[in-house]
Curated annotation (Swiss-Prot):
It catalyses: ATP + H2O + a folded polypeptide = ADP + phosphate + an unfolded polypeptide. Keywords: ATP-binding, Chaperone, Cytoplasm, Isomerase, Nucleotide-binding. It holds the Pfam family Cpn60_TCP1. It is found in: Cytoplasm. Belongs to the chaperonin (HSP60) family. Gene3D superfamilies: GroEL, GroEL-like equatorial domain, TCP-1-like chaperonin intermediate domain. Together with its co-chaperonin GroES, plays an essential role in assisting protein folding. The GroEL-GroES system forms a nano-cage that allows encapsulation of the non-native substrate proteins and provides a physical environment optimized to promote and accelerate protein folding. Its EC number is 5.6.1.7. This is Chaperonin GroEL. It comes from Bacillus anthracis. One of its GO terms (molecular function) is ATP-dependent protein folding chaperone. Forms a cylinder of 14 subunits composed of two heptameric rings stacked back-to-back. Interacts with the co-chaperonin GroES. InterPro entries: Chaperonin_Cpn60_CS, Cpn60/GroEL, Cpn60/GroEL/TCP-1, GroEL-like_apical_dom_sf, GROEL-like_equatorial_sf, TCP-1-like_intermed_sf. GO terms for cellular component: cytoplasm.
Length: 544
């Protein structure tokens, strides 16, 4: 396919049009008075959102060169979302400002490589200063403030703070769509996995259709049990102890299952069998997790153990086990704290090394189950459109809160970027490098300016006043007052602000050093079918 090539100024100008188109659509959502953007969906109702990355991903431009510019800025939003989970609109606004200012200087004859050096120096200084001024997040109320600012909803802030308090900072918090109008929190304590009882005859509570075992022994194996003789020795030992038994195996079937059910119904002993969770290597890892949590052993031929050799000592123990049709929850496992801590350390090390998003999610789940539980926020709304929008906001708030716990908080509303202004301005540089630093200085003002504009105010007036205020004091666009942002609870996670700045600078530097752009030439439209004129049936009469 033939290619279309543009060089230097012409190339950068074409791409800038794409940058502006995307950024202008995204930046209207910034701040407490930001507006929403409606996205058309081919099926179902349109999506109404104020989430920068969701809007950026939807934008596709007809002109290939403009589209490349738009995709570059979409990359800034996407990367910031991957690293920090929020701050995508701020990143887009910063990238647009740096690209715009940089292009003015390149057009005026500045050397792009010199500008790039200056931009990189300025960002390093800004990030260092952000680390200095960030404050660690402490207590439930601080967590609630971060979440409430991100979601623009105090109720959501309280829910997320409560969820994090209940399951800990490493706990898994998931979002589900609720059937009702209200948003609720549901916390599952202990280790839960998605496997239910092998037979409904094993239930102990017919009203709730669940089996509850108090202080049970837990037999953990990766084998299939089809012959009762295999587990008879250990079964007899458990019956002598007068305790219930939970069997976690690859499968329990045939004669073995029938014998267990008959004895359960006769009241000889209380036993529940469930299938082992997961598949393949993940199943082995999860069984090992359960064994460590309950102080038992995984009975597997890989370790030279068979079921006949199992004793009460090789079984796990727990305070309580609840088994429903679909889930099994093990509460208060009696495993040793040292072994559990070692296992947690092992999973954390794997988390740092993995590059797969799926593996990371599964490792995070395993970690949460060992640490203390899973919280589910059930999102409710009156309509499907509102539900989708609300779910996106809560997702952002959740990511924002996790980022705050990791690296602390800074003054919100773009104030922290203005607080590092003096440090960046003090960098000694000359020529194009100094111009690069000035480009970043101009960009640091942009989020505050845009928040003010979205609130219907004159952005430049707010920016100039902010330069004269002391660190931490900023403009609350929601009320129109000048306040101490940290004390008022208007805060941003330092990680979100840092990621937005670094990703914006990275793409802006690449953009300014672009000298040629290559795109596919649009294919000419196929000619329309020629008009058949008088070739109707009547005109063909002579051919009959």
């Amino acid at each position: 396919m033939a290619k279309d090539i543009k060089f230097s100024e012409e190339a950068r100008r074409s791409m800038l049009r794409g940058v502006d188109t995307l950024a202008n659509a995204v930046k209207v959502t910034l701040g407490p008075k930001g507006r929403n953007v409606v996205l058309e969906k081919k099926f179902g109702s349109p999506l109404i959102t104020n989430d920068g990355v969701t809007i950026a991903k939807e934008i596709e431009l007809e002109d290939a060169f403009e589209n490349m510019g738009a995709k570059l800025v979409a990359e800034v939003a996407s990367k910031t979302n991957d690293v920090a989970g929020d701050g995508t609109t701020t990143a887009t606004v910063l990238a647009q400002a740096m690209i715009r200012e940089g292009l003015k200087n390149v057009t005026a004859g500045a050397n792009p490589m010199g500008l790039r050096k200056g931009i990189e120096k300025a960002v390093v200084a800004a990030v260092e200063e952000l680390k200095t001024i960030s404050k660690p997040i402490e207590g439930k109320s601080s967590i609630a403030q971060v979440a409430a600012i991100s979601a623009a909803d105090e109720e959501v802030g309280q829910l997320i703070a409560e969820a994090m308090e209940r399951v800990g900072n490493d706990g898994v918090i998931t979002l589900e769509e609720s059937k009702g109008f209200t948003t609720e929190l549901d916390v599952v304590e202990g280790m839960q996995f998605d496997r239910g009882y092998a037979s409904p005859y094993m239930i102990t509570d017919s009203d709730k259709m669940e089996a509850v075992l108090d202080n049970p022994y837990i037999l953990i194996t990766d084998k299939k049990i089809s012959n009762i003789q295999e587990i008879l020795p250990v079964l007899e030992q458990v019956v002598q102890q007068g305790k219930p038994l939970l069997i976690i195996a690859e499968d329990v079937e045939g004669e073995a299952l029938a014998t267990l059910v008959v004895n359960k119904l006769r009241g000889t002993f209380n036993v529940v069998a469930v299938k082992a969770p997961g598949f393949g290597d993940r199943r082995k890892a999860m069984l090992e997790d359960i064994a460590i949590l309950t102080g038992g052993e995984v009975i597997t031929e890989e370790l030279g153990r068979d079921l006949k050799s199992a004793t009460v000592e090789s079984l796990g123990r727990a305070g309580k086990v609840v088994v429903t049709k679909e889930n099994t929850t093990v509460v208060e496992g009696v495993g040793s704290t040292e072994q559990i801590e070692a296992r947690i350390g092992q999973i954390r090390a794997q988390l740092e090394e993995t590059t797969s998003e799926f593996d990371r999610e599964k490792l995070q789940e395993r970690l949460a189950k060992l640490v203390g539980g899973v919280a589910v926020i059930k999102v409710g709304a009156a309509t499907e459109t509102e539900l989708k929008e609300r779910k996106l906001r809560i997702e952002d708030a959740l990511n924002s809160t996790r980022a705050a716990v990791e690296e602390g908080i800074v003054a919100g509303g773009g104030t922290s970027l203005m607080n590092v202004y003096t440090k960046v301005a003090s960098i000694v540089a000359e020529g194009d490098e100094a111009t690069g630093i000035n480009i970043v200085l101009r960009a640091l003002e942009e989020p505050v300016r845009q928040i003010a504009i979205n609130a219907g105010l004159e952005g430049s007036v707010v920016v100039e006043r902010l330069k004269g205020e002391k660190v931490g004091v900023g403009f609350n666009a929601a009320t129109g007052e000048w306040v101490n942002m940290l004390e008022t609870g208007i805060v941003d996670p330092a990680k979100v602000t840092r990621s937005a700045l670094q990703n914006a600078a990275s793409v802006a530097a690449m953009f300014l050093t672009t000298e040629a752009v290559v795109a596919d030439k649009p294919e000419p439209n196929a000619p329309a079918m020629p008009d058949m004129g008088g070739m109707g049936m009547g005109g063909m009469g002579g051919m009959m």
